[in-house]
């Protein structure tokens, strides 16, 4: 059981051991309920037909929300990124989940992601702006540049700003982060 927990992202050997020992101390009905919940989630949760976010319905809650701005489309790598943006309660547009990032080293090319459906959606739905919200990494930058080149004939393309986290000290920031913070600067209001 410990080996299975260690396969989960963010779970190391000590946490895996704690989880396993905790479960072994639980009553059998709670363990069965936990196992049933895992199996139910696996069989009932799929992808939204429009944005590819996780959903138990053909359309996710965001795609069904009539109050969302249909002209803005935020592109994210996966549902975790979408949920992080939703926690801000600032973005009111639609989303498109790629299902990963272009990574030749890992054997992931553009054809393995939800890029063709993104192009179709932008063209079909008359999106006025696509916001690329991809991680500031080699893979994220590669994917952003690739998408920007494909999307510019159809619509305006922007990328979220990157810089220093709130509460951080300049002296501890690396050069790339500082460069991006300077490039993404805005006028004081």
Curated annotation (Swiss-Prot):
Record bears the keyword Nucleus: no
Zn finger (C4-type) location: 48-63
CDD domains from the UniProt entry: TOPRIM_recR
PROSITE patterns cross-referenced by the UniProt entry: TOPRIM
DNA repair as UniProt keyword: yes
GO biological process, one term: DNA repair
NCBIfam families: recR
Similarity-based family: Belongs to the RecR family.
Reported function: May play a role in DNA repair. It seems to be involved in an RecBC-independent recombinational process of DNA repair. It may act with RecF and RecO.
Protein name: Recombination protein RecR
Lineage of the organism: Bacteria, Bacillati, Cyanobacteriota, Cyanophyceae, Synechococcales
């Amino acid at each position: 059981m410990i080996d299975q927990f260690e396969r989960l992202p963010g779970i190391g050997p000590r946490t895996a051991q704690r989880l396993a020992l905790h479960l072994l101390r639980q009553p059998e009905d709670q363990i069965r309920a936990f196992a049933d919940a895992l199996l139910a989630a696996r069989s009932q949760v799929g992808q939204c037909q429009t944005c590819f976010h996780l959903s138990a319905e053909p359309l996710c809650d965001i795609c069904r929300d009539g109050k969302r701005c249909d002209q803005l489309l935020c592109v994210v790598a996966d549902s975790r990124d979408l949920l992080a943006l939703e926690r801000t309660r600032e973005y009111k547009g639609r989303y498109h989940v790629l299902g990963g990032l272009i990574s030749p080293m890992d054997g992931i090319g553009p054809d393995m992601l939800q890029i063709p459906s993104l192009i179709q959606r932008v063209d079909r739905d008359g999106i006025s702006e696509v916001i690329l919200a991809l991680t500031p990494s080699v893979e994220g930058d590669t994917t952003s540049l690739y998408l920007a080149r494909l999307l510019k004939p159809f619509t305006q393309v922007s990328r979220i700003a990157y810089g220093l986290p709130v509460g951080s000290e300049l002296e501890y920031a690396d050069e790339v982060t500082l460069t991006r913070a300077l490039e993404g600067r805005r006028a004081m209001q």
